[in-house]
Amino acid sequence: MTRIAVLGVGLIGGSIGLAARRRAEGATVAGWDPDPRALERGLERGAIDERCGSVVEALDGAEICFVCAPVSQVAATARAALECGGDCVVTDVGSVKLAVLEELAGSGLPDSDLERFVGGHPLAGAEAAGVDHAREELFEGATWYLTPTERTVGLLYERLYRTLTSMGARPSAIAADVHDRLMATVSHLPHVLANVLVGQAASELVEESQGLPATGPSFRDATRVAGANPPLWRDIFVSNREAIVRELDAYAAALEAVRERLRAGDGEALERWIEDARTDRQRLLEGELAGGPVSELRVPVPNQPGIVAQIALALSEAGINIVDMALYPAPDMRSGAIALWVAGEGSAERAAELVAGLGYAASPVDGGDG
């Protein structure tokens, strides 16, 4: 029976608990939260099996720990969990990854603890916060980014990967700095812009009669996330400020280019710009929905920390989708094999070439889904 610790029983923590208890076979969930009312409600809703009075109590015997704390508190909470020892893999759910890794690396924790931390970020959520809004199916089909490092223990990474898969998520490895740049582009910048748009409209539509009824659906769609959870987004903006500022600079340059076309009355350039946006949007959506046949590869590797992370990150950076994975240690525990199932036409061949470039031999296995 797998014991899972959830530190922070809110929307995400509660949804993890519900999904794990109902989908991960044999899982029990121990919850801890600084707010006793959240624990009580989590127990009533079936999100946790046990209310714990401390992080130490929640981690007792746990195999996986989910840190579901505000971004500014993730590193401190993760450190407290890692200090409990054992072979528990500790992960988080925040949308900023590099700052957490850097803070943990500078915390004085030994490598034996740091190698048990794998940053995580599910691309799922809701506008309403709190465990009352938690849902078992929140992560169904959702990408769940994982940021393993050269320290990561392969067996612990696989344990986390399989648990997330059983909860309906699609785990995907990504480097922490790449993750933060990506989130700055597709999540954090849109939140900044939504707030700017609302502020601009509020200053322009000064009369109450010119309020929201004067706006169209485009404005409502573009500003849906404006004003969302100010303390949460304050922490996200500050923690990922370098990446967000870079994106704002690029955005300002793009706006300047549009302004120049408008000043010049260059309708043809504006039309091409809009057409390019439509093409790019379609390409991005097609990439998100891409699937294809699934093939299995076996990769013999030595039993050393970081190898699973190295391979998973290399394939992810090449755009190869790992749909499942398994580790098979040799009896002497000095070596073993990684089984990888990759999706898409030609992905198996590309994956084998990439793995070979890392110094490992990858062999296709007949009888896959594709």
Located regions from the model:
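Residues in the short beta-alpha loop(s) of Rossmann-like NAD(P)-binding domains
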Residues: 33-35, 94, 328
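A conserved regulatory-domain signal marking ACT and ACT-like small-molecule sensing domains
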Residues: 280-370
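NAD(P)+-binding Rossmann beta1-loop-alpha1 motif at the extreme N-terminus of oxidoreductases
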Residues: 1-54, 60-61
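Interdomain hinge/lid region at the active-site interface
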Residues: 207-277
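Internal alpha-helical scaffold of NAD(P)-dependent oxidoreductase catalytic cores
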Residues: 138-227
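Rossmann-like NAD(P)(H) cofactor-binding subdomain of soluble oxidoreductases
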Residues: 77-132
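N-terminal Rossmann-like NAD(P) cofactor-binding module of classical short-chain dehydrogenase/reductase
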Residues: 65-66, 91
